[in-house]
Amino acid sequence: MTTCSPFKYFKTSPEIIRLAVMYYIRYPLSFRQVEDILHERGVDICHETVRFWVERFGSKFAGEIRKNRAGHHSNWQWHLDEVFVKINGERFYLWRAVDHEGEVLECFVTKRRNKAAAKKFLIKAMRKHGSPKIITTDKLPSYGAAFREIGVADRQLCGGRSNNRCENSHLPFRRRERAMQRFKTVAALQKFGSYQSQIYNHFNHQRHLESRQSFKQKGTTALTE
């Protein structure tokens, strides 16, 4: 039995829809700015259409990318960090797990930054991705308490600069947050954090290790996959 294409009832080609969604999630652009960029390339759409496409296909494209990512390996090292996000005046925390190659593994939103929240986040990440060899964190006491309960306290590595990889992974999210003029609901934050991280991984090449031509070619390939 053949499955129905998710683009069946759309007049615009799947390539244009994918391009618009990738532009919006990858770069700190507004819906109107994506509309203007596509208009300059001969594609006449409304900014509300871009919004609809992101809502409809953002998670789908992220899911396709997630299926093709590398799985667990023996010398895996994770970096954990959290950043606060304000929603309607209330402070929430976006927890993030990043591996030693800079790939974002998991994002999780909580109201608090205590032991229970850290434990819930770590269990969720380990169930999905397996158990790492080393887990690098900052000196937040919640991590140590959660690790002791789970039984992985011997794998924790605390340090300032050693956790820069995870802290740097927050930067694209912060730029995107400013462009969106903050999030309105926790569900919107969790949803966007999840698919933004997958698309970030998809385009996250080691630019300093490659020639300009190779880097640009890989970026073009990633955009069309």
Language model regions located:
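DNA-recognition alpha helix
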Residues: 30-43
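Two-metal-ion RNase H-like nuclease active-site motif
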Residues: 73-87
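Mobile genetic element proteins and their domesticated derivatives, centered on retroelements
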Residues: 20, 34, 50, 80-81, ...
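Active-site beta-loop-alpha junctions of metal-dependent nucleic acid enzymes
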Residues: 56, 107-129
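C-terminal domain-tail junction helix/linker
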Residues: 190-225
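Active-site proximal helix-loop segment of RNase H-like, two-metal nucleases, encompassing DDE(D)
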Residues: 169-185, 196-197, 201-203
